[in-house]
């Protein structure tokens, strides 16, 4: 319920655009996760779909929390507001969830038939 210039932040176009992107990221991530769960339930779990979901969902989480932090302005970086903790958690997940780079190499090997691991 934060206000700026006597108006609710949710009434500003750029805030609504950020909220829309956050929603799209959430729906996309859930769709990837659902597809992966469906494959696993059918006994068709494979490394590449898992890497796609991990890489993309970690990236989407990182972007979504950054957008939330932007919406909160200066409050988005203070410990009194949870968005700063979420942002830190998202950075950790982006790094430890197999790392974006490693998952991209797994996907790249699948697409090209050539391993680029060094």
Language model features by range: what are they?
Residues 1-118:
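Alpha-helical interface subdomain recognition
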């Amino acid at each position: 319920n934060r206000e700026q210039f006597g108006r609710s932040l949710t009434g500003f176009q750029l805030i609504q655009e950020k909220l829309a992107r956050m929603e799209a990221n959430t729906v996309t991530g859930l769709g990837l996760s659902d597809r992966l769960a469906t494959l696993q339930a059918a006994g068709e779990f494979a490394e590449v779909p898992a890497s796609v979901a991990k890489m993309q969902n970690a990236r989407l989480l990182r972007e979504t929390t950054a957008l939330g932090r932007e919406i909160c302005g200066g409050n988005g970086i203070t410990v009194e507001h949870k968005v700063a903790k979420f942002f830190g958690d998202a950075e950790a997940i982006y790094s430890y969830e197999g790392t974006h780079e490693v998952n991209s190499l797994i996907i790249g090997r699948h697409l090209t038939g050539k391993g680029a691991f060094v």
